[in-house]
Amino acid sequence: MLTKNINFKNFKLKKKKLNLKKKFLSIINDENQVINSLTNYYRNSYSKKFVKKYKKTSNFRVIGMGGSTLGTQTIYNFLKDKIRKNFIFIDNLQTQKNKNENKNFTNLIISKSGNTIETVANAHIYIKKKDKNIFLTENKNNELYYLAKKLKSEIIHHNNFIGGRYSVLSEVGMLPAELMGLNASKFRQLNSLIKNKNFVNALLLNVSSTIDLIKKKKI
């Protein structure tokens, strides 16, 4: 065949990819606080000393909704074989009480706004007198902040610029991960990933394909 040794290039697709790459690099190089939370430059609002206080604690209960708990649940389920701690997740009002409920727990109550109705309700349902409690919420007047003050509990600041769905590599996901005995810096790998050309090219190709499908109303 005459075309056997001819390589065809889709210049339209190449131009799209180039424009997308420029936008990607612009976002990466910009001082974006959410992007920063994916890197090892991010500074947690809790200390290693704080984590060590709970080193001998075996039972944890995570109370929250949606993005406040899903990331932590994913980490726990994926790495369960390496984790020697017991974590229970309360993420709706229908959650059945576990057979271990007679044990003492350290509760992690998570809500950015501090006013999520289900989280506030479950906090009142599950917190017992002998439990230790850690609240992750914004440092402002809200229902969980008031409850934490009333119980004289630990309060970890939830940065207001990170929404629930983007929060897994912030305090919301990394504090529970460190309480599991995992290392937060092992998760924040954006610094090294953006230096990997294969990763960046695959990412851009996937994003470009997704955008095209959305424009064509196929997804």
Where are these regions (language model features)?
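Short, functional N-terminal and low-complexity linear motifs
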Residues: L18-K23, N141-L144, I155-I156, A202-L205
